[in-house]
A protein has these predicted regions:
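Electrostatic, structured charged patches in enzyme active sites and in nucleic-acid/phosphate-binding
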Residues: 1-144
Length: 144
């Protein structure tokens, strides 16, 4: 069985973190993003798993909840305040062509699409952005 990096993150700048206790990271990528949020001077507030977005599961037909990984407030390069909801995902979970013939991967991809559409709609109604960040975005891999 694969071991995943998990643990509690201790912010160096706890005044920036929105939440009552130390956030939990569920992957090394989430850990790196928490560190980025904590140390980046442009990010003035951030939260982990703080938002609940309702959506209908297309496989069960039941109403359920999607909890995106992060919620951040920052100042962009033009000095404008921005807010984003962020999901950290491996690229293979974001591209249909990367699912291959594996049925489980295909179902996982399809469910992600429904969750992310709900997140986009929720964010649009609040005037904020939704972004999916992959390893290519975080670590600039893939020839960029």
């Amino acid at each position: 069985m694969t071991k995943y990096a998990q643990g509690k993150f201790r912010p160096k700048n706890p005044d920036k973190y929105i939440g009552g206790s130390m956030p939990t990271y569920r992957s090394s990528w989430e850990f790196h993003f928490m560190k980025f949020c904590d140390e980046n001077p442009s990010i003035y507030k951030w939260a982990s798993e703080a938002i609940k977005i309702p959506y209908r599961n297309p496989f069960t037909g039941k109403q359920t909840i999607y909890v995106p990984d992060f919620f951040i407030h920052y100042v962009d390069q033009n000095g404008k305040q921005k807010t984003e909801v962020i999901e950290i995902k491996p690229e293979m979970h974001t591209l249909k062509e990367k699912t291959g013939r594996n049925r489980r991967n295909q179902l996982h991809w399809a469910l992600n699409q429904v969750k992310w559409e709900a997140a986009r709609n929720w964010c649009k109604s609040k005037g904020i952005a939704f972004r999916i960040i992959t390893e290519k975005d975080m670590f600039h891999t893939g020839g960029r």
